[in-house]
């Protein structure tokens, strides 16, 4: 289902959020923040539920996503830790668990045998695809329930956080 959003309305809401953040009564700003956090939290919870149904801890699911979604489709333990903002030792333990489940392989670097990379196995990719398909069903249902105002409020706050502005149909960094 494709939902079309009026870019000029969205940009107006983003500007209103910025302005309302600078006044004494910031209710309008926090209204947008609340909506954005509600939408993001709900979507993340839906993703976590599907990961659990797929037999993964939600953080293990994130590990697989980060590895598979990286440009080279491989990451070192240190990089996994950075991407998830966790300790390298914890990242190493999660990779070991995923390796035992058959979802990750650890391979030595061709250039430096001391460096190991984690790669997602075919089985791991298939699991990610299945989880994603189920997530999409649930997210589509959830987002269809949102009003246009709620959707625009959430998007405008995310745009504000990322410093993005809509200008004559083109996205620019504010």
Which stretches of residues belong to each language-model region?
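N-terminal leader segment of winged-helix/HTH proteins
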Residues: 1-54, 101-103
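C-terminal regulatory/oligomerization modules of transcriptional regulators
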Residues: 1-24, 148-174
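Charged, amphipathic alpha-helical coiled-coil/dimerization segments
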Residues: 11, 18-19, 96-155
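Pre-recognition alpha-helix immediately N-terminal to the DNA-recognition helix
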Residues: 35, 42, 62-66, 126
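Solvent-exposed, charged/polar functional surfaces in cytosolic regulatory/catalytic domains
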Residues: 42-50, 83, 126, 130, ...
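N-terminal helix-turn-helix DNA-binding core of bacterial DNA-binding proteins
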Residues: 45-87
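Short, hydrophobic-biased segments on the C-terminal half of alpha helices
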Residues: 77, 95-96
